[in-house]
Amino acid sequence: MAETYLLDKLKSVEQTYNELTLRLADPDVAKDPSEFQKLAKARSSLEEVVNCYVEWKNAQEELADAKEILKEAVGDLEMQEMAKVEVEDLEAKLESLENQMKIALLPRDPNDDKNIMLEIRAGTGGDEASIWAGDLVRMYSRYSENQSWKVSLLSESLADMGGFKEAILEIKGDHVYSKLKFEAGVHRVQRVPVTEAGGRVHTSTATVAIMPEVDDVEVEIDQKDIELSTARSGGAGGQNVNKVETAVDLFHKPTGIRIFCTQERSQLQNRERAMQILRAKLYEIKLQEQQAEVSSIRRSQVGTGSRSEKIRTYNYKDNRVTDHRLNQNFSLVPLLEGDIENVIQACITQDQQERLQELAASSSTPISV
């Protein structure tokens, strides 16, 4: 069984794939490296689903043959049993291939291949919330290192008792946004703070925002909307005082976004960094507006919802992490050490299944082929 919409789409993709193959064999196209590369990339993006479709068609033919053998094997119990097993195996294979093809046909998020800025803000809980924000900075840094991604601290606001009031990490590598976009939301922790003498469990939160890297073309910023001031990076006194005003305090009047950037060595570099962060924040606002429109049709999007969405609770007493979107529990210690790949893969799978259900609900009645 395969849905009509799926077969129509697969036939169209296969036709496009074959046309691209012919164009790549054209000597005139080969003379234009830019055009050749563009066509090769387009063909490569279709290769997985086309190969799967070819395998599916072959399995359909094998299934028809096996059913014919089963039909003709009247009185031959051994042949009937062999044919029956083959039919069952092929039906299971076809079901698996259909699911693979559906997933391969799902629209890709255009931001999936982008680098990101990961912002962590301390939420409710006072000093403990800032310490918790610091723990999350460490967790994501460890995970990024495990993925062979490059991590750098773009901006920070240190808390008096340790940790961060706010921190922004820049993470660069392969498919960063495609994975970490599921981490956006409120992360709640339940534990006894180091500042708690009575041993009582406190609940604190930190908010994570995932902002895909953007350039000037994607986000327009009117310079009239920006107020810029400078300060010394080292603070009020001590050995680390920078006597030159290299720190940049940027304020975006329409949105109220304020960015204080001190990480770079020169005022110009800090200004560029602050503008880079502002572009990412404005782009994130635009994405959230788009997602709000989608959510009126679709109840929610896993992990890419609003910042107010509580996505996970970290319970120290029970050594348990509960992901509220998945309704699943995970061991606390490995996650805090950056081993969050299993959680992220579970979110990706859930997201795919939800989109497949929507696709099926909006499509035609299944037909037999």
UniProtKB/Swiss-Prot annotation:
One of its GO terms (cellular component) is cytoplasm. GO terms for molecular function: translation release factor activity, codon specific. The modification N5-methylglutamine is found at residue 239. It holds the Pfam family PCRF. It is found in: Cytoplasm. Keywords: Cytoplasm, Methylation, Protein biosynthesis. SMART domains: PCRF. The keyword Cytoplasm applies. The keyword Cell inner membrane does not apply. Methylated by PrmC. Methylation increases the termination efficiency of RF1. InterPro entries: PCRF, Pep_chain_release_fac_I, Pep_chain_release_fac_I_sf, Prokaryotic/Mito_RF, RF-1. Peptide chain release factor 1 directs the termination of translation in response to the peptide chain termination codons UAG and UAA. HAMAP family: Rel_fac_1. Belongs to the prokaryotic/mitochondrial release factor family. This is Peptide chain release factor 1. It comes from Trichodesmium erythraeum (strain IMS101).
